[in-house]
């Protein structure tokens, strides 16, 4: 499918760990598989590197059904409960230390539901990640999120979608209490001071009203059809976000054949649509004209900014030259890393991008045209 990174759920709500933990006995040491010496995290990380994927780890510490932890909170009252709470915080910190120190550089560490507030019931994991994985993406606690959830588990984000945010994470004290948090997550804030780009997550088995993050038998008919995946791609990647697909390994630890086949089809279709532009141009200016080698049908264009310089474009329009005259085919606001515009097919000899509003000189690294059947 053209994925750049993969993230393994190393531990989830049961508390069971998929590695050889020295601090959490409820792990692969407790099973008969490989005589209790297996390490799925290591196998996963090694496989990612073998096949050119960046490895990440997803850590669930918000819930632990074995230990009776609910929303970071140990059950009970009084001194005994307070001692259990302190012990659980240390356990979580030690598990994070193990995962940060045993597997080399990690691309991302993702805490399910966040890692909470270390000044309260949450473990103090951010200093551990900073010390042992200083270059990884951190997601997230009450103080910091290197990217943000896009406001739904539909694999889409709203438009416009800005990578900037008014605070270093959602639900931060710097965000005014009357702000709609979900809308803010979906759209970001064009004037925000923090770079917190959006991600759009959804399970691959999410069709027909299902929403399966974990494997279920006889569930292959709920894999998203290709046309729905492409729609999600255009409404996530094409709106300046990252698309994250949840995959469900079966009891043998394998991605089922049907899921694998759909991912291959997905990657093939992305390449079919967008790997061969009719023409392409770049430049640091407010207007770019893309000349085609002949009159031909056009129904898509892609615009990309050099995000090393931030998001400068605030409003734009795209025109097509049809029978010698310019006519507007689409317009928008946010661009960022990538904006995919689909419009009614026109027979054109050129496309023209005009930036109508910007906060600095636009730095456009890609303006390209496509004809997609």
What does each of the following model-derived ranges do?
Residues 321-323, 372:
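Inter-blade boundary loops/turns of WD-repeat beta-propellers
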Residues 348-350:
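Extracellular Ig-like/FN3 beta-sandwich strand-entry sites
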Residues 359-373:
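Edge beta-strands of jelly-roll/beta-sandwich modules across compartments, strongly enriched
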Residues 1-320, 328-343, 354-363:
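Mature catalytic domains of secreted/periplasmic carbohydrate-active enzymes
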């Amino acid at each position: 499918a053209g994925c750049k990174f993969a993230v393994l759920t190393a531990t989830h709500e049961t508390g069971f760990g998929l590695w050889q933990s020295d601090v959490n006995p409820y792990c692969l040491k407790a099973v008969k598989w490989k005589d209790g010496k297996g390490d799925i995290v290591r196998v996963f990380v090694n496989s990612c590197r073998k096949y050119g994927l960046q490895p990440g780890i997803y850590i669930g510490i918000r819930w632990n059904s074995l230990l009776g932890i609910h929303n970071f909170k140990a059950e009970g009252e009084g001194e005994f409960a307070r001692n259990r709470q302190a012990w659980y915080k240390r356990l979580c910190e030690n598990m994070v230390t193990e995962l940060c120190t045993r597997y080399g550089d990690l691309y991302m560490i993702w805490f399910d539901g966040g890692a909470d507030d270390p000044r309260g019931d949450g473990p103090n994991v951010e200093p551990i990640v900073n010390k042992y994985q200083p270059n990884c993406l951190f997601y997230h606690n009450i103080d910091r999120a290197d990217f943000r959830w896009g406001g739904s588990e539909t694999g889409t984000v709203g438009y416009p979608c800005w990578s900037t945010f008014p605070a270093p994470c959602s639900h931060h004290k710097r965000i005014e209490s009357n702000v709609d948090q979900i809308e803010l997550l979906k759209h970001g804030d064009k004037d925000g001071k923090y770079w917190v780009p959006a991600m759009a997550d959804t399970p691959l088995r999410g069709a027909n009203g299902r929403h399966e993050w974990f494997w279920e038998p006889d569930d292959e008919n709920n894999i998203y059809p290709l046309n729905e995946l492409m729609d999600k791609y255009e409404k996530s990647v094409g709106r300046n976000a990252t698309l994250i697909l949840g995959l469900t390994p079966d009891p043998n630890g394998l991605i089922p054949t049907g899921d694998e086949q759909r991912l291959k089809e997905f990657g093939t279709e992305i390449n079919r649509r967008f790997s061969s532009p009719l023409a392409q141009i770049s430049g640091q200016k407010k207007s770019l004209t893309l000349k085609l080698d002949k009159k031909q049908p056009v129904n898509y264009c892609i615009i990309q900014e050099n995000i090393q310089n931030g998001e400068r474009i605030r409003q734009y329009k795209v025109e097509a030259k049809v029978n010698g005259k310019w006519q507007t085919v689409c317009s928008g606001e946010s661009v960022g890393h990538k904006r995919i515009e689909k419009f009614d097919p026109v027979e054109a000899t050129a496309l023209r991008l005009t930036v109508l509003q910007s906060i600095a000189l636009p730095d456009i690294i890609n303006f390209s045209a496509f004809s997609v059947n």
